[in-house]
């Protein structure tokens, strides 16, 4: 078995290649207007295929409809699946030299530098790339960059918890009113949630986690699921800190941020595959994503020159109790990630339930 594994690894290495000593990462810098790129994309066929990390099939329907309304005649075929599965499927396409995807947007930030070094990504700077925070992009090749800041917030239903006026810390969740009221994503099933627990427990220790377990939280798969359950009247659970709903997630839902440990934020990262079948369509999509027009609609912009929509703070870099640059380093340290997964799996058991894409929650 070990000999076969060695042969497989050597074969994989022989089929991959490294661009470092090629000294050829200079990007194409876009100078055309959106309208000019739009007409080029229509001439190409008007189709874009995007794989976007997420845990609900319809999670990017708003992006699809907004884009298609903005650019009549364009079809945005967008598939949502867990980033930890999509990256492997992309590797398979690259291995087989059979790329069918134009654009990828994923949470697995550790993949992008590797793909860039393998020569799998298009070195291309959309208009607005120069405005993106340096920490959120490959400044040399322009092959990848964040397009929106994702983050976990504290969220609760004010109708279900009428006596809770504010939640200002993770320690608050150990109070009696939250007994049987919490719904949380398994940390051993999502690396961004894993990082949330890691950051919290670096400050509050395992004593906090022991106390949290005594509150009998409901553990679920997927990060959209907790907010869905919190929002729905037919579930008793009424608070979470492992979901992303922006600053105004819905009626009767209040959002707050902790003061006793950092919350997780990161730039959800995008790239165009070098052998994308619809390169002009992909360029249109990425220029739109980094445009001021689109960036003004997201909760927290990746651009330095745009104030965040709905945030009490001017930008992500001046938001207290978070550091959007550290998640990428965490994701690169797969040894630590695996050790933490097993720690939580030992305490909680393996993640139970159907994939969040098909569980109808």
Locate the predicted segments by residue.
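Fungal secretory targeting signals
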Residues: 1-18
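Extracytoplasmic "Venus flytrap"
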Residues: 17-34, 44-62
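Extracytoplasmic ligand-binding site segments that recognize negatively charged/polar headgroups
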Residues: 49-65, 77-87, 91, 98-235
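Periplasmic-binding protein-like
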Residues: 133-136, 149-151, 209-213, 219-220, ...
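A bilobed periplasmic-binding-protein/Venus flytrap-type ligand-binding module shared by bacterial periplasmic
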Residues: 153-160, 266-278, 297-301
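Extracellular/periplasmic juxtamembrane helices and adjacent flexible linkers that interface
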Residues: 288, 292-361
């Amino acid at each position: 078995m070990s000999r076969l594994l060695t042969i497989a690894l050597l074969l994989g290495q022989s089929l991959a290649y490294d661009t470092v000593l090629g000294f050829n990462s200079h990007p194409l810098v876009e100078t055309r207007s959106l309208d000019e790129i739009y007409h080029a994309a229509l001439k190409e066929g008007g189709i874009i295929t995007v794989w976007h990390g997420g845990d609900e099939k319809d999670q990017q329907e708003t992006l699809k409809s907004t884009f298609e309304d903005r650019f009549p005649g364009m079809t945005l075929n967008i598939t949502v699946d867990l980033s930890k599965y999509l990256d492997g499927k992309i590797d398979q396409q690259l291995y087989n030299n059979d790329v069918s995807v134009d654009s990828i947007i994923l949470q697995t930030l550790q993949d992008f530098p590797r793909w860039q070094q393998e020569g799998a990504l298009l070195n291309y700077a959309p208009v607005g790339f120069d405005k993106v925070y340096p920490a959120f992009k490959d400044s040399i090749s322009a092959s990848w960059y964040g397009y929106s800041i994702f983050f976990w917030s504290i969220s609760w239903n004010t109708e279900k918890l009428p006596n809770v006026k504010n939640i200002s810390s993770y320690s608050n969740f150990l109070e009696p009113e939250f007994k049987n009221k919490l719904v949380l994503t398994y940390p051993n099933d999502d690396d961004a949630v894993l990082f949330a627990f890691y950051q919290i427990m670096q400050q509050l220790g395992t004593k906090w986690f022991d106390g949290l377990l005594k509150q009998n939280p409901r553990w679920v798969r997927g990060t959209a699921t907790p907010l869905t359950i919190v929002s729905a009247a037919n579930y008793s659970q009424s608070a979470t800190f492992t979901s992303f709903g922006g600053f105004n997630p819905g009626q009767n839902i209040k959002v707050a941020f902790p003061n006793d440990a950092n919350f997780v934020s990161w730039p959800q990262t995008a790239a165009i595959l070098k052998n994308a079948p619809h390169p002009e369509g992909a360029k249109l999509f990425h220029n739109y994503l980094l445009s001021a027009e689109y960036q003004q609609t997201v909760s927290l912009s990746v651009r330095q020159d745009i104030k965040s929509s709905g945030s009490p703070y001017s930008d992500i870099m001046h938001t207290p109790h978070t550091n959007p640059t550290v998640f990428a380093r965490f994701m690169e340290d797969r040894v630590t990630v695996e050790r933490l997964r097993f720690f939580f799996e030992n305490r909680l058991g393996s993640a139970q339930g159907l994939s969040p894409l098909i569980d109808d929650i």
